[in-house]
Amino acid sequence: PHSSYIPKQDLASVKENMKGDFIGIGVSFYNYKDSITVIRAIEGGPSFRAGILPGDRILMADDDTIYGQNWSDSKVIERLRGKKNSKVQLTIKRTGVDSLLDFEIIRSEVPIKSVVASYMINPTLGYVKINRFAESTFLEFEKSIENLLSEGASNLVLDLRDNSGGFLQIAEQIADEFLEDGTLILFTKNKTNEIEKIFATAKGRFEKAEVYVLINENSASASEIVAGALQDNDKGIIIGRRSFGKGLVQQEMDLGDGSAIRLTTSRYYTPTGRSIQRSYDKGSEAYYDDYYQRLEHRAVDTLQSDLLAD
């Protein structure tokens, strides 16, 4: 599972998403069962500002029907992206809402920052939200915690909700900030049962801190590595919903025609030997059905909470 082929026309946008800004509507999505389902609206982007929510299903873009068309990811991206300040009308199906919703999105620069929030909650408790583990994430994180430490932070809330993962090495660097030298962060095991152990190596700036890690059903892969390492080493309290359950390691290999493949090469385990990977025994459909059902329950729970709050 999670092995994939990336066509040449998709590869540039995939790599772009792990680097700089781009012009578009600013959503991460799953293309499954003829349905384009929003994982998250990127904070600071046009869809986030317009009120698009996780679990929303995009049915139409202007007069183009997207639902049921078997569009590839690259075609969806091509349709949703466009020139700066151009408009696109999205028709959305939202769980818990009977009627369809229309949103006018003005395409603009989508900020792809990893650390999207960093501030003091009280005189000793800092807060950092990381939305992905990309090339620049650790440098952004370092800068944020240096600022928090200068403001008096001795404890930290690490928000990994809706963080779908990224580079394993970056997750290891983040976890290292909370763990003492020589502490096991994770280990991987491949098909031949070869084991590779990853240990903390540097002096972490929050080794003595109380750490609270926020997760939800969209916290996956690298997010689960960090959360699992802190939990198993009794360095962090996990708060939130059950995470996605992706405990596999992929390696990307570029091909001669400009495309690439990502192959699952090993399974990772938390320090106590737990595998985060959800069962794939019933196949891809059941695997993702479980995820979508959880998204729908989340949307209903949110709607009910909003009604109670009113």
Language-model segments: residues:
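A generic structural motif
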Residues: 30, 91-95, 269
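Short, small/polar residue-rich loop motifs at catalytic or cofactor-binding pockets
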Residues: 262-263
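Structural motif
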Residues: 55-57
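Conserved functional hotspot residues or short segments at active or partner-binding sites
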Residues: 271-310
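PDZ/PDZ-like peptide-tail recognition elements
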Residues: 2-40
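Cleft-lining beta-strand/loop regions that shape enzyme active-site pockets
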Residues: 12, 37-40, 46-53, 62-65, ...
